[in-house]
Amino acid sequence: MSARIVVVLNQKGGVGKTTTSVNLTHALAKLGKKITVIDFDPQSHLAVSLGSVDTQTSGIDKVLLEGASLAEQSIPVRKNLNLVVAGPRLQEIEQLTDGGARRGDLLRRALLDGNRDEDFIFIDCPPSSGVLVANALFAADEILVPMTSDYLALQGLSHLVGTIRKFESALKRPYKFSLVMSRYIPARRMSKEVLSVIQKYFPGQILATTIRETALLAECPSFGKTIFEYRPGCRSARDFMALAEDFLEGRMM
């Protein structure tokens, strides 16, 4: 079986990207899907959010730089959910000067192993546009973009879509592309205005459930817990479970 490779990407920071990666993957795992999530950000926020605090453990850095297998570097962190940490050398990928265009194809080649049994491989990207993001985009089947409902995020989305179009042109294939509204404040007028603009330009590409802004989601990472462990049954946990169901069923606004 070939896993579906989902890149969680936004070149703007502070949009709930890692929060989405952590809680969506755990929700999918709770629904019985087999998931591997790769921390592809040298800051290692995803791994810390899942309770893996040893940032010196090798992970995807060893896969890309030394040819280790992904299976060797996978750590079971929850039922049905494996983690591949960033590793202390991941930042070296950005400084690679040898290999030409192959520098951007390291991850795709590492994921070609057909003996894996995951349903999904999620890649949590850094908020940048360098060699790491290029590797993720060359490997991706699908791109999931967390978005906040403010105008700066809207500007950043325009730039990101331009980047994605260039990769689609180079690969001669389209990505499956969807947006998730993160840190959404229903009572705020700007939230509704920005969502309306996004719906106009991306019809049928916004997952149906919005992730509402709550303090609980900001608190979880410091305890190394997902929202389902930190406050099971709360509004945010319900939001992420509904989002996971939207994701599986292709349910859009």
Q: Which sequence ranges carry the predicted segments?
A:
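P-loop NTP-binding core
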Residues: 1-253
